[in-house]
Amino acid sequence: MIQDSMQFAAVESGLRFYQAYDQSLSLWPIESEAFYVSTRFGKTHIIASGPKDAPSLILLHGGLFSSAMWYPNIAAWSSQFRTYAVDIIGDKNKSIPSAAMETRADFAEWMKDVFDSLGLETAHLAGLSLGGSHIVNFLLRAPERVERAVVISPAEAFISFHPDVYKYAAELTGARGAESYIKWITGDSYDLHPLLQRQIVAGVEWQDEQRSLKPTENGFPYVFTDQELKSIQVPVLLMFGEHEAMYHQQMAFERASVLVPGIQAEIVKNAGHLLSLEQPEYVNQRVLSFLCGGIK
């Protein structure tokens, strides 16, 4: 009886999440198509926009935010690229996991599968927070697949989290904890769109062990070593917000600037962790300027 109740709660909370996700996609300002591709870790949900014959840009979202978070950026970027907003498998989104991804090597293999399923030999990459860390990891493990990379507010990667990250993460058990977490990372300078906030709350309340990314020793979050960062050969644009809550952005900026060859790193004023949402106009143009410099 208890098991049946738990399964019912998981299904019910999952349906609420899917409904909230679809509602948040009403913010998507341009035509798109959604589909799944097969990987060794399960079916990965992707939202594609832009001309099919344009260069490819793969987008990786922040944890709990799903691909819906790209709504303020997608029109600008899809004017020059065929964009693929990928739901990171194992997080709260529409991807359907069938096997656990536990290591950084696993995550890189998953991304290779996504490339292969899309028929892409190479692509540009852009990601925020968790998605940004995935990109740094992929640059080390499959640099030949990446043209240029944009890393925004990466989750660790260059410097350890502030202890408050784990305090707020431990409280992510319901609506109140989710709202507290969102308020913490946005501060007083930005209000998340109610539809996106509702989706995040629904994700936190979704009782699904397969969609619950947990820290692991060989997974994420992770601070890359000096040797790893020095070995990056792909052109990288790295962006932080001046009001970053999760770590000391100036220290991360300085470490990246010293270690990563040729990196373009900057700290953007009047923004925090959710840089692409908080300052979309600036981020959109800066990313296009950087990426279009690498179109062959």
From Swiss-Prot:
It is an enzyme of class 3 (hydrolase). Its EC number is 3.1.1.1. It comes from the Bacteria. Gene3D superfamilies: alpha/beta hydrolase. SUPFAM superfamilies: alpha/beta-Hydrolases. GO terms for cellular component: cytoplasm. The active site is at 129 (charge relay system), 244 (charge relay system), 273 (charge relay system). Keywords: Cytoplasm, Hydrolase. Belongs to the AB hydrolase superfamily. This is Carboxylesterase YbfK. It comes from Bacillus subtilis (strain 168). The lineage of its organism: Bacteria, Bacillati, Bacillota, Bacilli, Bacillales.
